[in-house]
């Protein structure tokens, strides 16, 4: 039943939008993305289903049309837009469309990622957020978000040490991740521009240049290891193409 899983349901949406009959078959799904870690596992399933179905229809949908479907399914474009387009996406969903701007990630920027064996469901991570925040903090977050984007465009990566400072979700969600502040500090000491929570957590991500990425990743993982928390570390680069059929 395609309605019982995200991949099948996403495929069903493409067939309906393309006004073509549903194709039935057996799908084997393998993923390296663990659930409940703030890494966009649901978006991965949605976009994977969309691309698979789009490869089967006679008149494939555009990326813009796929993004509208993905946004409707996910409820926001935050993860599905970059999954479809690659790079950094600044997007907002409207009633029947998504406004999306793609910004190239500087090739010299790498990412040190640590995934601890700590599950944080998206629903629970949302529940710890306050209903209201001080106006001053909201203004500061807008300022930092703007600085973040412009720093990537201008390759002024040292600005990320300030731009990654967040008031909206990190102060609240870090309470769900043991030793979060220690990991952030270890990343900076090892050479990162800054670090933050990936999505709703528990994954933590540091922004760093290529020369220091391995050292930073090891330092982040070492904090969890020292506190007897299993973890995996990754040294990553930004994807610049988006999801592909291979």
Could you tell me what each predicted segment is?
Residues 1-37, 51, 59-61, 239-241, ...:
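ATP-binding N-lobe of GHMP and related small-molecule kinases
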Residues 6-15, 145, 183, 219-220:
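Short, well-ordered amphipathic alpha-helical segments that serve as non-catalytic structural scaffolds
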Residues 39-63, 84-86:
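DPxDG-like acidic metal-binding loop motif
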Residues 61-109, 175, 195:
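Alpha/beta catalytic cores of group-transfer enzymes, especially the acyltransferase/condensing modules
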Residues 1, 31-40, 68-77, 131-136:
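A short glycine/serine-rich beta->alpha loop
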Residues 109-185, 189:
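Acyltransferase
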Residues 152-246:
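Glycine-rich, charge-dense phosphate/pyrophosphate-binding loop(s)
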Residues 16-25, 53-69, 96-99, 213-219:
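Phosphate-handling active-site elements
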